[in-house]
């Protein structure tokens, strides 16, 4: 499952809910979760592609995510894209970053090649 923005949040929530998918990709999605939810097992591969200048992903959100991924024994990775804002992959956005968008897509294809083999 691949999702951008709100869809990226949905992709991560799919992993959190342990739906039977081989892997999820969250591209500039929301990474936080309600603090009342406990961390549980994560049974799918997870790729998170995050713009470095996304104000919605604070250091605390990232710290909580790392803790959640590790406690859930997930096969996970986060790639952070320099000089990129929230909509860095959208060619119609003033924040579009062509170089980083191409890298994100390359990383997505590499991940899918591993997950779907």
Spans of features found by a protein language model:
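Short, proline-enriched alpha-helix->beta-strand connector loops that line the catalytic pocket
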Residues: 41-46, 72-75
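Acidic catalytic loop of the alpha/beta-hydrolase fold
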Residues: 53-57, 86
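Short alpha-helix in the alpha/beta-hydrolase fold that links the catalytic acid
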Residues: 58-68
């Amino acid at each position: 499952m691949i999702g951008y923005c709100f869809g990226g949040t949905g992709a991560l929530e799919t992993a959190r809910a342990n739906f039977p998918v081989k892997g999820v990709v969250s591209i500039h999605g929301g990474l936080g979760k309600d603090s009342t939810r406990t961390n549980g097992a994560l049974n799918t591969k997870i790729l998170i592609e995050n713009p470095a200048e996304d104000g919605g992903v604070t250091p605390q959100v990232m710290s909580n995510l790392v803790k959640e991924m590790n406690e859930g024994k997930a096969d996970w990775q986060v790639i952070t894209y320099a000089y990129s804002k929230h909509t860095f992959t959208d060619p119609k956005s003033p924040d579009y970053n062509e170089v980083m968008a191409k890298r994100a897509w390359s990383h997505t294809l590499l991940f899918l090649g591993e997950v779907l083999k």
